[in-house]
């Protein structure tokens, strides 16, 4: 991110319920989360901008581009196989490598605080397992994992981390409307070769007219942490026309 910020004004956001952002009890559907970002960019004075999202940021980035196309110049989305309900979802019974990447979604959707009761106090077990099975051969550095374990040890942060999944049904209904109008701006799908690979880009083709794909070798789900130089190169090339037109300049 510091390298990308040499050429662009970079706004790094913790989405609602995550990291250092507020953790309300509701408002975790993709439309509301996208609206949060538009409101933030209004405050910062950015009328038009490019969007980069990873994992849940893929879902939010798609919603942001679909709901507010006049604001988004181009969008790069990494490491899921398409927006829920737009791209075909994996079936319930899948081979182990796919199951490793999706099992947490129905688990995280369970309400009545069951997930919090099962995971609370065991954040290192739950999230450590996720980091390991989705990380490919490289995994995540211990200090990065510890940072996330500490964040999720806050009960409100843990609850907030499940919020997007518990609003999945609302987001699915929203995406039924979104997919009726394909995105017109350029879209880049980024996949880790040991994770979703080409499916990160393929999953956006039902939702957009201009989709490019990049697969980053020797990486699992955590492409930015595992291959920062390759990720930077992919983003810099994709964002170059935006910069040349005066967008995002420092």
Question: Positions of the model-derived regions?
Answer:
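Short amphipathic alpha-helix adjacent to the substrate-entry channel of hydrolases
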Residues: 1-9
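Catalytic histidine-centered segment of alpha/beta-hydrolase-like enzymes
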Residues: 219-232
């Amino acid at each position: 991110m510091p390298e990308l910020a040499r050429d662009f004004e970079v706004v790094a956001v913790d989405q609602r319920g995550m990291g250092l952002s507020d953790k309300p009890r509701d408002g975790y559907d993709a439309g509301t989360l996208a609206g949060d970002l538009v409101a933030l960019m209004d405050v910062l004075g950015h009328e038009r901008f490019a969007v980069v999202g990873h994992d849940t940021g893929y879902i939010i980035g798609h919603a942001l581009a679909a709901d507010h196309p006049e604001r988004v110049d181009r969008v790069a989305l990494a490491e899921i196989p398409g927006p829920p309900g737009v791209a075909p979802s994996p079936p319930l019974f899948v081979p182990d490598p796919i199951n490793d990447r999706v099992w947490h979604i129905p688990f995280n959707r369970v309400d009545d605080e069951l997930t919090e009761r099962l995971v609370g106090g065991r954040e290192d077990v739950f999230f450590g397992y996720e980091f390991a099975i989705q990380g490919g051969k490289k995994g995540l550095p211990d200090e990065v994992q510890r940072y996330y374990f500490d964040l999720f040890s806050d009960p409100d942060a843990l609850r907030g981390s499940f919020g997007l999944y518990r609003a999945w049904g609302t987001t699915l209904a929203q995406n039924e409307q979104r997919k009726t109008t394909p995105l017109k701006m350029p879209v880049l799908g980024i996949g880790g070769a040991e994770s979703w690979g080409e499916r990160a880009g393929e999953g956006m083709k039902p939702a957009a007219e201009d989709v490019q794909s990049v697969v980053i070798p020797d990486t699992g789900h955590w492409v930015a942490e595992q291959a920062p130089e390759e990720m930077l190169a992919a983003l810099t090339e994709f964002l170059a026309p935006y910069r040349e037109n005066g967008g995002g300049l420092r």
